[in-house]
């Protein structure tokens, strides 16, 4: 997408042919800053500290982390150690596991002398596939927005999104935002309500920043505003991304998504989830009890970053000293509250049957594996 009118991706191989460039998302929206990753540990740290974040981008970064690891040591033991180190960085995002499994499988049949080249090639392939997948998600989702506009052509289509499932969460385009960008570029008038998404404020810091750079009309709202907007007919469509979807359609996404889905269900607002097929965990059915929910540090809740009147970036405490804090990174929205899924293969119901209809090979393969695991 565009930054100051220049097309950018979120991750790339630098001109030296081996170091990996990223946008440091911890500096946004106050500073656009890039970073250079040169080792396995730097890639792992970028994921853990959320310099890169969003399930698809985490998967791509981890793949490049494996490639960086192979530069230092391409032995079988090093492959397993790099895989395990990166897998431990963010437990909720299934794309991380998927990308690492793909690299490990490729490297397991590649001679050590060729593993560096092969790892970079596979990581680049995953990145390019992500761009095409997000573009396809955008095309399918745009038709939902087009349909809403045809029903009421005299005003913009009002959308609500939570967290950041945008360009910054993928290599390009985004998942939840891809339909919005394509609709905007096609001349369909849209307006986006952007949840601030505490405690890390990915909506206020990231989604609003990227929408603004692309020229998409938007309004940032406090997290608890969505229900009020829906009650008063100010939201035509809620669309979010996801870090993991189970085989039966339960959705893990940034904390607060479940509450938005409840409000949408109560007010009759369509609630769609945009995702690539790689985000589906075909071996898991019950998301509420089966998806591991990441807990993060207290300081994300007790402190907040902002810019002072004289331009300084400061972090200040907002919670009374001594107050205990709980910081759950994600929640799970049951499939019954989700209108449907927007995927690279089209739209489907939020159900086991709906997902299996779009991804029959994966569904059949995982069903066989579950039977084998239960035997």
Swiss-Prot record:
Site keyed Transition state stabilizer: positions: 163
Family per record: Belongs to the eIF-2B alpha/beta/delta subunits family. MtnA subfamily.
InterPro entries associated with the record: IF-2B-related (IPR000649), IF-M1Pi (IPR005251), IF_2B-like_C (IPR042529), Initiation_fac_2B_a/b/d (IPR011559), M1Pi_N (IPR027363), NagB/RpiA_transferase-like (IPR037171)
Gene Ontology annotations of biological process type: L-methionine salvage from methylthioadenosine
Substrates-to-products reaction catalysed: 5-(methylsulfanyl)-alpha-D-ribose 1-phosphate = 5-(methylsulfanyl)-D-ribulose 1-phosphate
EC class of the enzyme, as a word: isomerase
HAMAP family assigned: Salvage_MtnA
Keyword list, A-Z: Amino-acid biosynthesis, Isomerase, Methionine biosynthesis
SUPFAM superfamilies cross-referenced by the UniProt entry: NagB/RpiA/CoA transferase-like
Gene3D superfamilies: translation initiation factor eif-2b, domain 1, Translation initiation factor eif-2b, domain 2
Pfam family, one: IF-2B
Organism superkingdom: Bacteria
Organism, as annotated: Rhodospirillum centenum (strain ATCC 51521 / SW)
Function: Catalyzes the interconversion of methylthioribose-1-phosphate (MTR-1-P) into methylthioribulose-1-phosphate (MTRu-1-P).
Pathway: Amino-acid biosynthesis; L-methionine biosynthesis via salvage pathway; L-methionine from S-methyl-5-thio-alpha-D-ribose 1-phosphate: step 1/6
The protein's name in its UniProt record: Methylthioribose-1-phosphate isomerase
Alphabetized PANTHER family for the sequence: METHYLTHIORIBOSE-1-PHOSPHATE ISOMERASE
E.C. code: 5.3.1.23
One GO molecular-function entry: S-methyl-5-thioribose-1-phosphate isomerase activity
Location of the active site: 243 (proton donor)
Sites where the protein binds substrate: 53-55, 90, 202, 253-254
């Amino acid at each position: 997408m565009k930054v100051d009118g220049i097309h950018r991706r979120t991750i790339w191989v630098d001109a030296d042919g081996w170091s990996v460039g990223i946008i440091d998302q911890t500096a946004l929206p106050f500073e656009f800053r890039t970073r250079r990753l040169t080792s396995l540990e730097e890639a792992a740290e970028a994921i853990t500290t959320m310099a890169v974040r969003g399930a698809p981008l985490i998967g791509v970064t981890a793949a490049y982390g494996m490639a960086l690891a192979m530069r230092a040591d391409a032995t079988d033991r090093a492959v397993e150690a790099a895989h395990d180190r990166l897998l431990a960085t963010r437990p909720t995002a299934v794309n991380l596991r998927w990308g690492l499994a793909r690299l490990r499988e490729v490297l397991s049949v590649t001679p050590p002398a060729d593993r560096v080249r092969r790892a970079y090639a596979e990581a680049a392939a995953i990145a390019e596939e992500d761009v095409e997948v997000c573009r396809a998600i955008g095309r399918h989702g745009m038709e939902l927005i087009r349909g809403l506009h045809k029903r009421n052509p005299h005003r913009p289509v009002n959308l609500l999104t939570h967290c950041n499932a945008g360009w910054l969460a993928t290599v390009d385009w985004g998942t939840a935002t891809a339909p919005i960008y394509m609709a905007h570029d096609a001349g369909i008038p849209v307006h986006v309500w952007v949840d601030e998404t505490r405690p890390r404020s990915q909506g206020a810091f990231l989604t609003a920043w990227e929408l603004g750079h692309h020229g998409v009309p938007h309004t940032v709202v406090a997290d608890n505003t969505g229900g009020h907007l829906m009650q008063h007919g100010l939201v035509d469509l809620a669309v979010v991304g996801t870090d993991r979807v189970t085989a039966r359609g339960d959705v893990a996404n940034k904390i607060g998504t479940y509450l938005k889905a409840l409000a949408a269900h109560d007010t009759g607002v369509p609630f769609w989830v945009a995702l690539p097929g790689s985000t589906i965990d075909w071996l898991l059915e019950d998301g509420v009890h089966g998806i591991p929910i990441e807990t993060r540090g207290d300081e994300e809740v007790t402190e907040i970053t902002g810019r002072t009147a004289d331009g300084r970036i400061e972090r200040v405490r907002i919670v009374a000293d001594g107050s205990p804090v709980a910081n759950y990174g994600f929640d799970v929205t049951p499939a019954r509250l989700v209108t449907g899924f927007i995927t690279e293969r089209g739209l489907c119901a939020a159900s086991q049957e709906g997902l299996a209809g779009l991804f029959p090979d994966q569904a059949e393969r995982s069903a066989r594996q579950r039977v084998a695991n239960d035997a």
